[in-house]
Amino acid sequence: MNEKNKNDESKHQEDKLQDQKMWNRINKFFSRSIGQSAKRAPKPKAISKSQSFRILNRFNAMERNSIHMIVILSIISLLLILLLSPLMRFQKVEITGNHDLTKAEVLAASGINKKIPAWQLLSEQHYFIQRAEKNSQIKKVKISYLNMQVAQIKIEENSKVGLVTKKDKNYYILADGKFIPAQSVGEKPQRLPNYEKFPNDKTIKRVAMQFNGISKALQNSVSEVIWSPDHEDDEKVILIMDDGNKVLIKASDIKNKLKYYPGMVAQIDKNGTFNFQVGTYFQQY
């Protein structure tokens, strides 16, 4: 009988010791989590094994959740570091399709530079395109990616087709008839025809849009575009050519007829006037 009592008492002491260890573990966890001293934890009371098991399972679940949270935060931190890393920035931005505009002017218009992270250019592409197209000289923009290190900006320009003087100030005439100030600081002079004697901006726009329909080489061979209507043709235009010739042509026919000029000049070795108004003929000076 005494031996049985001793065994029961020993088992009871072991259970109490296990409970004490469990409470010590819980107190230690809470003291780390909220700064509460383990000494201030409530004095443990005797609990059953099933209660101990439930508490231990709950505690283990809390530990697992804490570990999961730490892993998630670590992954997010790693992603942020990668996104902001120099490795995630384009090392080169190529510009194509520009003739009048320089590479620096295209980049400035779009707001794109090497400091912009690759993810930002990818996610906000529409914004950069809209910003670039606000420039009067940029008609269309396309952004593509050759690889994760090289981006390409392809533009279609609203080309300069001439020069005009308005109120003692010089302006470039763009292909759509808009005007922009000429000769900005540091800008190289361009070889463009001067538009003379035009009565209004609307008439200039009509001729400019026609002029944009011919080749760049042919555009560059014209030094002056003179509005010169008469009783026979109310939209007659005189073109003074760099080669010493003169061309008479209807404004609305510039795109369709002036393209034949180079072939005609090649067959004539003297200077004179080429008339494209009614039919086509040459009159020597």
Swiss-Prot record:
Localization per record: Cell membrane
Compositionally biased tracts (Basic and acidic residues): 1-19
Residues on Extracellular side: 88-285
Domain POTRA: 88-158
InterPro entries tied to this protein: DivIB, FtsQ_DivIB, POTRA, POTRA_FtsQ_type
UniProt keyword RNA-binding, yes or no: no
Intervals, Cytoplasmic compartment: 1-66
One GO biological process term: FtsZ-dependent cytokinesis
Keyword Cell membrane: yes
Gene Ontology cellular component list: cell division site; plasma membrane
UniProt keyword list: Cell cycle, Cell division, Cell membrane, Membrane, Transmembrane, Transmembrane helix
Cited Pfam families: POTRA_1
Superkingdom, natural source: Bacteria
Segments for region (Disordered): 1-20
Transmembrane regions: 67-87
UniProt topology in membrane: Single-pass type II membrane protein
HAMAP family: DivIB
Function as written in the Swiss-Prot or TrEMBL entry: Cell division protein that may be involved in stabilizing or promoting the assembly of the division complex.
Family, per entry: Belongs to the FtsQ/DivIB family. DivIB subfamily.
Protein name: Cell division protein DivIB
Gene field: divIB
